[in-house]
Amino acid sequence: MQEKEMFDLTIIGGGPAGLYSTFYAGMRDLKVKLVEYNKELGGKILFYPEKIIWDVGGMPPTTGRTLINQLVEQATTFNPTICLNEHIVRMVREPDNTYTLFNEQGKAHYTRAVMLASGHGIPVMQKLEIEGADRYEVSNLHYTVTQMDIFANKRVLISGGGNAAVDWANELANISKEVVVCHRRDEFGGHEKNVEQMKSVTKIHTPYQIKELHGVGSAIEAVTLAHCDTGEQRQIEVDAVIVNHGMKLDGCFLIEAGLALEEDGFLRVSACMETSQPGIFAAGDVTRHEGKLQLISGAFVEGATAVNGVKQFLDPKADKQAYVSSHNEKFKKKNEQLKQEKQAQLMN
């Protein structure tokens, strides 16, 4: 029989909002659990680990992978419970006003409050809908770019027209032998200056889409493109194919939970980031509200605000927010450890 361990707060979603909220919940002395659908933490940033992020306050330009690593290290400061590879599909409010969360396998998580930090839902890359395409995924068919250097001196075809496709094309043009971009529309959805740059350093085929993959064994050697209006076909030789056709987002859990949504489908929240259900809070891309800041930094603020809301929901007499870390007793011992480590490094 499963032991019923109760947590103060269970956070669903391990992206920037969920990770920072996990850290801040530790500052608020909450017993916290973080549940993530994927096998590793990081959220949507996992799809673009080599993209450079400039807009996190106080940090120099850094890659998505580096930012994830730092957020994970920070999130584990107070030893939270972290569960990976778990898809929460049902939430039940119990008679004592606690919540029981169930994953796909029926495993239960018991909690006094919930924070939804799952973005627009579970992100799944849109795969190429061509028969037999999956057999090339082990070699040179890619749905994201995790290492730029594997495309060095290669002929690369990129299918897609959004920001990610445009950015990858510009980056790879610096190291690849040739970059070809195909898009089913004449216009690209990326930023105008980036699109102009892409057109100057790559070969563009519009409006074309991938019709057929040609390969030997598990590797693609050529691709047939078809004109979206006339059907005219052309074949190009390639060493690698990158497909970026957007993501499917599974957000049905929010609807089934009976939470109030805005007209655009995002969660409606109060000033303290509480949803329409008592004890259920939210932060990050899953929410919309007046003054919403669409930056990673905004997710941090919403996460901390939501945790403060949780703290007062559980204990109305609690302080409205935590003391800043520079004057917080919780960090006194940790600061001493850091000083000792720094002194030891200087002595060596």
From Swiss-Prot:
Q: Which cofactor does it need?
A: FAD
Matching InterPro entries, A to Z?
FAD/NAD-bd_sf, FAD/NAD-binding_dom, Fd--NADP_Rdtase_type_2, Ferredoxin-NADP_redctase_2
> Could you tell me the EC number(s) of this protein?
1.18.1.2
Q: What class of enzyme is it?
A: oxidoreductase
The record's GO molecular-function terms, alphabetically, read: ferredoxin-NADP+ reductase activity; flavin adenine dinucleotide binding; NADP binding
Q: Which residues bind FAD?
A: E36, K44, Y48, I88, P123, D285, S326
* UniProt keywords, alphabetically: FAD, Flavoprotein, NADP, Oxidoreductase
Which family does the record claim for this protein? Belongs to the ferredoxin--NADP reductase type 2 family.
Q: Specify the protein name.
A: Ferredoxin--NADP reductase 1
* Native species: Shouchella clausii (strain KSM-K16)
